[in-house]
């Protein structure tokens, strides 16, 4: 089979392959880029596999960088582009179920392709657009099937993360996992405990953001892979609730975590530790915590000025978008107007500062100062105090006077 239209990404990288070919070696585009080209999807990373050994590649090209030479990968720099070129290889046993104990360079494309995870990723493409399909990957693409290359038991024992990748592809591509491959995932899912949380998180998030997350979540639950993901062991019912939400694709990672937490009915006090267990960044944890708080408020209330102020426009709009999943009408434009109409949007917009209060009240700093500023801030946001210096200072004097009498 030949590609009728060769994507620009391949055209730009073709000189690398032609140069390797000119020196008597084989070279092909491989992996996800070939799959995505056949599916007419955007191509991200172009990977090249070759029969040339790393030292031979370094002799062919003037500008190279050793980025993973022990695994056969050399970065080739050509004009303003860079391409990863990896030698055909076979791999030995995998003691940690993730990385091979030993890599052996070979001259055979077939030996290289048969160690790959799924047939749809075991495709190669030469510089003329001719596709090399040794494991019926094109047929599986046509039938929208995710099938392990060769024996699925061996593939998942080599690299346990492949199970999560299979579930992710089911969601991303809207494909079905082939029966024997699915059975092997169900059998070997305990091996996921050998995989780092960070790697599991990447695949899990991609699964939630896929075009058919239900198509990934259903086998994720069925095979019990969730039991080896952070803090999900006892959360089967919550995952079913997540799966039952309307099918519209989730747009951002923060929204995905928010919908998951809401489906799990996590108490507010447990949200931070749950997200930390997934090794998320502090910024993302903060954003998601805000979104959950806003969503839970909005599901049973109209917006209140203080809640909008604390969330800010971006988070408030995301909350409105999330209402769709709970059969409530989203009012994005109204929400934007409500936020815009707030008297202030950040504390520094207050007409007074802590220094002003200390000067006028002639007091030393203490806990009282932060509490008083917060009280003033709330009154201004809610419209019960005008944001003018004299008004706010007068209010502050009255409040301190009350405090002294008390």
UniProtKB/Swiss-Prot annotation:
Required co-factors: Mg(2+)
Entry annotated with the keyword Electron transport: no
Presence of keyword RNA-binding: yes
Pfam family, one: tRNA_NucTran2_2
Protein origin, superkingdom: Bacteria
SUPFAM superfamilies recorded: Nucleotidyltransferase (SSF81301), Poly A polymerase C-terminal region-like (SSF81891)
Chain positions recorded as CTP binding sites: 32, 35, 116, 159, 162, 165, 168
Binding locations of Mg(2+): 45, 47
InterPro entries: Bact_CCA-adding_enz_type3_sf, CCA-adding_enz_C, CCA-adding_enz_firmicutes, NT_sf, PolA_pol_head_dom, PolyA_RNA-bd
One MF annotation (Gene Ontology) recorded for this entry: CCA tRNA nucleotidyltransferase activity
Entry keywords, A to Z: ATP-binding, Magnesium, Metal-binding, Nucleotide-binding, Nucleotidyltransferase, RNA repair, RNA-binding, Transferase, tRNA processing
One biological process term in Gene Ontology: tRNA 3'-terminal CCA addition
Disulphide bonds in the chain: none
Reaction(s) the record says it catalyses: a tRNA precursor + 2 CTP + ATP = a tRNA with a 3' CCA end + 3 diphosphate; a tRNA with a 3' CCA end + 2 CTP + ATP = a tRNA with a 3' CCACCA end + 3 diphosphate
Record-linked CDD domains: NT_ClassII-CCAase
Residues holding ATP: 32, 35, 116, 159, 162, 165, 168
Its EC number(s): 2.7.7.72
Role according to the record: Catalyzes the addition and repair of the essential 3'-terminal CCA sequence in tRNAs without using a nucleic acid template. Adds these three nucleotides in the order of C, C, and A to the tRNA nucleotide-73, using CTP and ATP as substrates and producing inorganic pyrophosphate. tRNA 3'-terminal CCA addition is required both for tRNA processing and repair. Also involved in tRNA surveillance by mediating tandem CCA addition to generate a CCACCA at the 3' terminus of unstable tRNAs. While stable tRNAs receive only 3'-terminal CCA, unstable tRNAs are marked with CCACCA and rapidly degraded.
Miscellaneous comment in the UniProt entry for this protein: A single active site specifically recognizes both ATP and CTP and is responsible for their addition.
Family named by the database record: Belongs to the tRNA nucleotidyltransferase/poly(A) polymerase family. Bacterial CCA-adding enzyme type 3 subfamily.
Subunit structure: Homodimer.
Name of the featured protein: CCA-adding enzyme
